[in-house]
Every structure is written in C-alpha cells, then in structure tokens.
C-alpha cells in the first residue's frame, strides 16, 4: 500500500496533480484545500488513499494525514 508520494509537480489544477517521482508521473485526484496548499510549489509530498476495483484504479491525494483520515471516515 502507498502511504504518500513525494516528487516534482509537473501539472496542477483544482482537481488533480501530476507528481513525477523517479520518472513515473502519478495522476492524483485532490481537494481544493490540497490544491491551495500545492499552488505555487515545484515539489510536494501528498498522502495517498488508493481506490481500486475491477475496472478502475485511482489515487486520491491529501496535503495532510488528518485530511486523508477525514476522507476515509466519510467514505467508510
């Protein structure tokens, strides 16, 4: 399981960030709060919630562990 991804921000918009880590670009869905924290930065550490089912695999990213835990409580 992935706890966080740390890397260079190659793309950023209010709903997602692309983090490049060792030559791999990870597409991570983010909240507006996380977007505001990342805006203007070139590097980031994003805490990950990995969502996977038969036809879909997504990474949700959060600026803090607390934000991720709240998300997990809401979907749980």
Where are these regions (language model features)?
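Conserved hydrophobic positions within beta-strands
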Residues: 7-9
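Short coil-to-beta-strand transition motifs
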Residues: 1-5
């Amino acid at each position: 399981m992935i706890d966080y991804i740390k890397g260079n921000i190659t793309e950023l918009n209010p709903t997602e960030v692309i983090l490049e880590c060792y030559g791999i670009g990870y597409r991570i869905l983010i909240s507006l709060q996380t977007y505001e924290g990342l805006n203007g930065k070139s590097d980031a550490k994003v805490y990950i919630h990995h969502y996977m089912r038969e036809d879909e695999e997504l990474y949700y990213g959060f600026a803090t562990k607390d934000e991720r835990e709240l998300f997990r409580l809401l979907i749980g």
